[in-house]
């Protein structure tokens, strides 16, 4: 509980610091003062959520490191966005990327694109928000006897307040905080699970490299979902569609000082995400090793492995807190 409260307090401190020089004119662009490296870090955490924290390690037992093929496609997709879409948006000095649709195709297309974005973000955010609220209910509100509906309303109010306070500038800095927390969490989880397996750094690397689950590339069967070209090409087009044409994510890059800074932030973010996802996959492998050593059973087709290990009685309580 103290961890959760402390995190929200830290969010509000970051929000207050970010919003000190904000006004109505800079709410959507952040005054175009965001440093490229802050945008890069923020872009790492923006598409990653608690669902990623559970599902990516969870898929390793069934699909090995095949997800990395798609992530490599993500990195290529970020280059396409940086060199094709970003110059287009900056050249027209757009606040909303859907403003280009109005210039090119007219008002109806603009409104249609904006509404599709709005509806898709509501649905996606609803799923992520539900996962967060379920976790908060189990860890914090349920022990206090507080109903789930109160949990939902309080969480919505907190998110609304820290976002409203500074606009996109606050969003960028809080996403940066989230990115750092996520990366630290996965690194610490790897450390503590590795410690439970009596691995030093060399032993950990050796165990992961020799594991059957650490295979990355799959070229042998084109009909399989793990086939390289399916994953790689899907990754490229997914990032172009879900990041390059997404106002929520591109608004962060449009807050950069200029097109050069925006490109730099996107490219660094795309490359860094390869390493971050690699950490999640490594965590997945050592979780399967821990399950095997402790004789714990789980369904390989589900994402339950991290939760089982995190709350195992023999595991460090820190892993449960980080989870």
What are these regions (language model features)?
Residues 68-164, 234-239:
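Helix-loop-helix module between adjacent transmembrane segments
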Residues 32, 38, 54-69, 102, ...:
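Loop-to-helix junctions at membrane interfaces in multi-pass transport proteins
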Residues 10-24, 84-98, 158-161, 165-167, ...:
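Juxtamembrane interface elements at the cytosolic ends of transmembrane helices
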Residues 1-18, 30, 34, 38, ...:
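Extracellular loop-to-transmembrane helix junctions
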Residues 8-11, 46-47, 74-78, 118-121, ...:
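Residue-level recognition of pore/gate-forming positions within transmembrane alpha-helices
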Residues 10, 52, 77-84, 93-94, ...:
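Membrane-embedded alpha-helical core segments of multi-pass
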Residues 1-53, 163-166, 179, 185-188:
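Membrane-interface "cap" regions at the ends of multi-pass membrane proteins
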């Amino acid at each position: 509980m103290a961890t959760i409260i402390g995190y929200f307090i830290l969010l509000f401190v970051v929000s207050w610091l970010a919003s000190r020089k904000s006004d109505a004119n800079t709410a959507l662009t952040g005054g175009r003062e965001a440093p490229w490296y802050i945008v890069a870090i923020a872009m790492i955490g923006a598409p990653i959520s608690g669902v990623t924290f559970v599902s990516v390690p969870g898929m390793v037992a069934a699909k090995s490191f095949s997800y990395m093929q798609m992530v490599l496609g993500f990195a290529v997709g970020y280059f396409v966005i940086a060199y094709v879409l970003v110059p287009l948006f900056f050249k027209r000095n757009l606040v909303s990327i859907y403003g280009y649709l109005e210039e090119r195709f007219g008002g109806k297309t603009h409104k249609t694109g904006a509404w599709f974005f709005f509806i898709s973000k509501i649905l996606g955010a609803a799923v992520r928000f539900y996962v967060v609220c379920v976790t908060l209910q189990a860890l914090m509100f349920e022990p206090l006897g507080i109903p789930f509906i109160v949990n939902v309303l309080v969480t919505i109010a907190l998110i609304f307040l820290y976002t409203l306070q500074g606009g996109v500038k606050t969003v960028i800095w809080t996403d940066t905080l989230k990115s750092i927390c996520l990366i630290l969490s996965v690194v610490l989880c790897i450390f503590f699970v590795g410690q439970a397996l009596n691995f030093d750094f060399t032993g950990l690397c050796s165990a992961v490299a020799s594991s059957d689950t650490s295979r990355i590339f799959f070229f042998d069967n084109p009909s399989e979902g793990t086939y390289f070209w399916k994953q790689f090409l899907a990754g490229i087009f997914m990032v172009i569609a879900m990041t390059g044409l997404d106002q929520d994510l591109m608004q962060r890059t449009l807050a950069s000082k200029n097109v050069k800074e925006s490109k730099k932030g996107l490219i660094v973010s795309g490359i860094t995400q390869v390493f971050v996802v690699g950490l999640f996959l490594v965590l997945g492998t050592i979780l399967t090793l821990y399950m095997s050593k402790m004789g714990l059973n789980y369904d390989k087709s589900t994402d339950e492995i991290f939760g089982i290990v995190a709350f195992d009685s023999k595991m460090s309580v820190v892993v449960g807190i980080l989870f």
